[in-house]
Design a protein with these regions (language model features):
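Short, well-structured alpha-helical interface segments that form or flank functional binding sites
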Residues: 34, 38, 42, 71, ...
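Acidic, metal/cofactor-coordinating or nucleic-acid-engaging core segments within structured domains
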Residues: 102-176
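Predominantly extracellular/lumenal beta-strand repeat domains
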Residues: 46-49, 53, 67, 72-74, ...
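Non-catalytic C-terminal interaction segments of nucleic acid-processing enzymes
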Residues: 156-204
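Short, flexible loop/turn elements at secondary-structure junctions
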Residues: 80-82, 93-97, 128, 143, ...
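Acidic-basic catalytic patches of nuclease active cores, encompassing PD-(D/E)XK
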Residues: 6-62
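Conserved catalytic cores of phosphodiester-cleaving nucleases, focusing on short active-site segments
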Residues: 76, 89-97, 124
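Active-site metal-binding core of divalent-cation-utilizing nuclease and nuclease-like domains
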Residues: 56-89
Length: 204
């Protein structure tokens, strides 16, 4: 089965944002001491329930979109309920701070144990995540220490340092929700990132 069938129209973006916002509001199973993959799975289960029962368009959500080219996989993908399981939105989840650290982050840039790029925004810019023709992508952050304000300053300072041509995260009308605009590294064009930050600093 072909799993890289993508709808580039971006016409479902508002429904997807609704699903994510509502899913985060129902985040009763998320906590700081859980592994990132378990918190992500809990969110995905909620996103999927909302997408197939509460939206005009049937939109599913699953973990780990496997690419046919084997270059990488996103933590979360949203898809249409059609014969091709058409992908319409990708999202990457990151812990703040990085696992087993107090202040490091891989939200903007980073290196994996095999010296490959591991930063969330970085991987979208390189085309490892997302698709150059799909101009809207997502990031979720699980805030486990410090305040949202402190992490916002850290992340925006890193964007300014590493990618001065890109915009910082800008607060929307929704709490802990941001947008930013980025250029691609290897080809022309820009894309918008939708950021959803979930404060788990007071949970156990």
């Amino acid at each position: 089965m072909h799993f890289d069938h993508i709808d580039y129209s971006n016409k479902y973006i508002q429904e997807i944002l609704y699903i994510i916002r509502l899913g985060i509001q129902k985040r009763n199973k998320l906590c700081r001491n859980k592994r990132e993959v378990l918190n992500t799975q809990s969110l995905v289960d909620t996103f999927n329930m909302i997408g197939v029962t509460m939206c005009e368009t049937l939109i599913g959500a699953q973990k780990e979109h496997e690419r046919e080219d084997g270059r990488g996989k996103e933590d979360i993908y949203f898809y249409l309920n059609d014969d091709s399981y058409t992908r319409i939105f990708f999202a990457e989840a990151k812990r703040l701070p990085k696992y087993k650290t107090e202040s490091e982050e891989e939200y903007v840039v980073g290196k994996s144990s095999t010296n490959n790029p591991s930063g969330g925004i970085e991987r979208y810019k390189l085309g490892i995540h997302g698709n150059k023709n799909l101009r809207n992508n997502g990031m979720l952050a699980f805030i486990e220490n410090k305040s949202v304000k402190e992490w916002l300053q850290i992340v925006n300072n890193k964007i300014t340092k590493e990618f001065p041509q890109d915009s910082p995260l800008i607060l929307t009308d929704n709490t802990n929700e941001y947008t930013s605009v980025h250029t691609y590294v290897n080809h022309e064009g820009v894309f918008t990132m939708y950021h959803f930050w979930i404060d788990l600093s007071l949970t156990r």
